[in-house]
Amino acid sequence: WLIPHMKTNVGTISETVIQEAIDTLEENTGSQVNFIVCSSGVKRAYQKALAAYKRNIDVMELQGGYKALSYNGIPVVSDRFCPDGTMYLLNTDDFALHQLCDWKWLEGEDGRVIKQVANKPVYSATLVKYADLVCTRPCGQAMLSGITEA
């Protein structure tokens, strides 16, 4: 159950490729994909594929005023940190932020939070939070790689 669904060497992106991955997740794990993230080149390739079929490109409004492409009501968002030629199909309900504690100020050896920077009329302090984003059901996610970018 720790291994996500992976398809490599996809080539040209299409709605069929995306739907096959979604169907596999639903049939094997009961996971409902609600967020798709990909590289900018993959997003352009997906737009190009939709335009080739003379279809209207569905755009949806996300929280915060952002707009995204849509695949069957699922937002398709590009991210600059996503590897080239890669698309992730995620169920965001399977992710949680786990933290050791809430935000806190680091104290020095003398118990002070605010410290003067040496030889300057400037003070500094450090605010920290030790947390990590954890996926509780990796098998409910999918990765498509080797997609030809536009």
Question: Where on the chain are the PLM-derived regions?
Answer:
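Sequence/fold signature of self-assembling virion shell proteins
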Residues: 1-23, 31, 47-150
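Beta-edge loop/turn motif
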Residues: 33-42
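Active-site nucleophile-His-acid catalytic modules used for acyl/amide transfer and hydrolysis
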Residues: 28
